[in-house]
């Protein structure tokens, strides 16, 4: 699986605490191997028409992504649970 990172995702990632960055990288490796691994809690977001999905970094942080084609995904944003879902409403 290939992951493409939005510029906004990269900016958000750089601002995260070191422990969250490490956890996010670990979850990304799991995601590449098995996008529906139980630890990721992969879910399609509402409204479903936006085709946005989330995976869990930990209890507080999420990564929002969109499926592209040919086993490629686009990581759009990373942040705290409440903020990230408000963010997706603007997409």
Question: Model-predicted segments: where are they?
Answer:
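Arg/Lys-rich, positively charged N-terminal/basic patches that mediate binding to nucleic acids
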Residues: 1-27
């Amino acid at each position: 699986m290939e992951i493409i990172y939005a510029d906004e995702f990269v900016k958000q990632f750089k601002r995260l605490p070191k422990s969250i960055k490490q956890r996010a990288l670990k979850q990304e490796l799991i995601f590449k191997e098995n996008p529906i691994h139980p630890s990721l809690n992969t879910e399609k977001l509402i409204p479903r028409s936006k085709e946005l999905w989330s995976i869990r970094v930990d209890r507080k942080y999420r990564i929002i992504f969109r499926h592209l084609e040919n086993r490629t995904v686009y990581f759009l944003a990373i942040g705290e649970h409440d903020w990230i879902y408000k963010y997706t409403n603007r997409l």
